[in-house]
């Protein structure tokens, strides 16, 4: 399923002329890494469940006993079957523009879900995944908000348009603090999320041109719009 999720959007982009064939090269890089990680976790789980020697049995007993009283030890007995793989070395990742926000939502990481509020209606960040790219903007300035809306408008004729989720005054409300906690994002931050729910890039206070440049390889209409504006 993860293989399919990784490949589906890339195939769609290439087949619909939104990206060059080279985008498909990242599939092998990312999923070979994931396979190696899964094999390593599988070996770890097997050795934990069926210790091959006395040393492994001793370690397992110690971990099980400590896990009852120390939560930090519990990860040792977690086979990681419920957590997605990160793509830390993906060639698609952009340079991290907000390293101070912490590792949880860095480029290459699965974008954490967070519950937001649209008035009385709950909205989850993950509801926007699965089709186009998503820009998550946290309390953007008025000028940046206008620029991001313009970017989204420039992609409306694309097969899978860009979506902008604005959080803060006039937008969605981080009433439960989950976005702030899980993304480490402060006012002015912008996070760019791939269609498969992985973080492509993030910035603490970007210029609109930075965001436009990040999206241009996936939305030719954005590049065309920028060229037309420059000629005007």
Predicted segments with their positions:
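A conserved FAD-binding loop/helix module that cradles the flavin
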Residues: 1-3
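Helical substrate-recognition/capping region of FAD-dependent monooxygenase/halogenase enzymes
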Residues: 13-232
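Active-site-adjacent scaffolding segments
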Residues: 5, 9-15
